[in-house]
UniProtKB/Swiss-Prot annotation:
This is ATP synthase gamma chain. It is found in: Cell inner membrane. NCBIfam families: ATPsyn_F1gamma. One of its GO terms (cellular component) is plasma membrane. Belongs to the ATPase gamma chain family. Keywords: ATP synthesis, Cell inner membrane, Cell membrane, CF(1), Hydrogen ion transport, Ion transport, Membrane, Transport. SUPFAM superfamilies: ATP synthase (F1-ATPase), gamma subunit.
Length: 294
């Protein structure tokens, strides 16, 4: 009977776990839908900035206003220092979401170090911070809370530290790594070179009538736009990462719920078999006792 009690207790425990994972899946699904909408709205503004940058860059090229120069666009002859900014979740229970980001960061870290470059790691998210601290890596900067609750002003202040170091010549590249949202069941790793900006993709020919600027204004407008471009890239990456996190957690909790369901089924079969064996044993004992009394 002790065996039956143990099995029954396990069934109850697994059912409670199943309720928890099912609830977490529903919460993640609801959060994903909200984050999806926010991502769409943010992407709209990012696309608008990219379109304006393309027009301004083409205008500068058309009128040859000082050329497209400056620290923002200069590819270094040799990369001595690289800033790698990476985004992970503040929480777990989201499958391989954090692992994939960490794996990509380590791969890029080793690649640049093998070329003799110094890599400065800047972590956003508790899970990434905990991993690299545990592994003994030095983090140049870290922040908790921003990946789970993206805020434009906080994202702006965070990325401007790297922008400032880059413009002052302290770093040669700024790379942003995060796990991005593709659809409800798929995430994709993204590694974006924020600085220097590859201006070639923004200098395609556009209709000159779309934008007219005075020569002395174009450089100022471009500089202001570049900062917005970098800020929005950081902000959108945070939202994109959060959507991917909710998607990964939703899948992980769905898998856990299904596993719990299968475990309950298996334990129920074991319980019924054990109960049947117990009843059979008791019947045999009763019959044996009656036979002994004859």
């Amino acid at each position: 009977m002790a065996n039956l009690k143990d099995i029954k207790r396990k069934i109850g425990s697994v059912k409670n776990t199943q309720k928890t994972t099912r609830a977490m899946k529903l919460v993640s699904t609801a959060k994903l839908r909200r984050t999806e909408e926010l991502a769409k709205r943010t992407k709209y503004f990012e696309d608008a900035i990219n379109a304006t940058l393309r027009q301004i860059a083409s205008s500068i090229k058309k009128y040859k206003v000082g050329g497209i120069k400056g620290r923002y666009f200069e590819e270094p002859e040799a990369v001595a220092v690289v800033d790698i900014i990476f985004i992970t979740a503040d929480k777990g229970l989201c499958g391989g979401f954090n692992y994939q980001t960490i794996k990509t960061v380590r791969s890029l870290l080793e690649e640049y170090q093998s070329k003799g470059a110094k890599v400065r790691l800047r972590a956003v998210g508790k899970k990434g911070i905990e991993f690299f601290n545990f592994q003994g890596y030095e983090l140049n900067d870290s922040v908790v809370g921003l990946s789970s609750s993206p805020n434009y002003e906080e994202a702006k202040n965070y990325i401007l530290k790297s922008v400032g170091d880059f413009l002052e010549g302290k770093t040669d590249k700024v790379i942003l790594i995060h796990n991005g949202y593709k659809n409800m069941i798929t995430q994709e790793m993204k590694a974006i070179q924020l600085l220097p900006i590859d201006i070639s993709k923004y200098t395609e020919e556009v209709d000159g009538s779309m934008l007219e600027m005075e020569p002395d204004e174009s450089e100022k407008v471009l500089e202001s736009l570049l900062n917005k471009y970098i800020e929005f890239n950081m902000y959108y990456a945070l939202i994109d990462s959060l959507a991917a996190e909710h998607s990964a957690r939703m899948q992980a909790m769905d898998a856990a719920t299904n596993n719990a369901k299968e475990m309950v089924r298996s334990l129920t079969i074991s319980y019924n078999k054990a109960r049947q064996e117990s009843i059979t044993t008791e019947l045999i004992e009763i019959i044996s006792g009656m036979e002994a009394m004859k």
